[in-house]
Design a protein with these regions (language model features):
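Short hydrophobic/aromatic patch on the recognition helix
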Residues: 44-54
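Hydrophobic/aromatic-rich alpha-helical bundle segments in the mid-to-C-terminal region
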Residues: 105-115, 119, 134-179, 187-188
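Short, flexible, glycine-rich and Lys/Arg-enriched loop motifs at helix boundaries
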Residues: 27-37, 104-115
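Amphipathic alpha-helical interaction segments
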Residues: 18, 38, 88-92, 96, ...
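Basic, helix-initiating cap at the start of DNA-binding domains
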Residues: 1-42, 59-62
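Helix-turn-helix/winged-helix DNA-binding modules
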Residues: 31-32, 52, 139
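Hydrophobic alpha-helical connector segments
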Residues: 63, 70-103, 113-114, 123, ...
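Alpha-helical DNA-contacting segments of helix-turn-helix folds
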Residues: 54, 61-68, 108
Length: 188
């Protein structure tokens, strides 16, 4: 979680945000066992400042996880999935995840954390996939859980392509949506 402190100043919030941004970048590139000194340098702060905000790696990872889940959940809520066509909603889902790629990619490094993240984010995606099957857009020979696994894998690949600057946000989202839909679209 974010540090709990009586310090509610904008400076405190900016420093906390800088630390989380730096941690997301460093951890997505080097893994969650990366040296915290690297996180501090990337954030433009001293190690002592880092430890004032987050007492240890676990506290930093917990805060980063909460931040990532909040960011993706906000984007999914704002995406209007229930009002969009299934195809458009899938592209919006991909765009939401790719847009917070570094933060979400960190979650994927730890299976327990990833399962917790998917637990919180799965419901709207399961609903979308079930709607796709029900309306005949998505194939009905695969259960929602399997389609969800394929979608999750597609999300991760789109994030990686964007992080490596192989594709921009919009390109990665659109290409991944086409890839997913081409494989899961209902057959005539």
């Amino acid at each position: 979680m974010a540090p709990t402190s009586s310090k509610s100043s904008p400076r405190f919030d900016r420093t906390s945000a800088a630390i989380l941004d730096a941690a997301a970048k460093v951890f997505s590139e080097e893994g969650t066992s990366a040296n915290l000194a690297t996180v501090a340098v990337t954030a433009g702060i001293s190690r002592a400042t880092l430890y004032r905000y987050y007492a240890n790696r676990e506290a930093l990872l917990e805060a980063l996880t909460a931040d990532a889940l909040d960011a993706v959940a906000r984007r999914l809520a704002d995406a209007g999935l229930e009002r969009a066509t299934v195809e458009d909603a899938i592209e919006r889902v991909l765009r939401a995840f790719v847009a917070v790629g570094d933060r979400y990619a960190v979650l994927t490094g730890d299976q327990t954390t990833l399962e917790a993240a998917h637990g919180e984010l799965a419901a709207p995606l399961h609903d979308l996939l079930a709607r796709g099957i029900r309306t005949g857009v998505l194939r009905d020979d695969l259960p929602v859980e399997i389609l969800y696994e394929f979608l999750a894998a597609t999300i991760l690949k789109a994030i990686k392509l964007n992080q490596r600057h192989r594709l921009g946000l919009e390109e990665a989202s659109a290409a991944a949506a086409r890839f997913f839909l081409d494989g899961t679209r209902a057959r005539d």
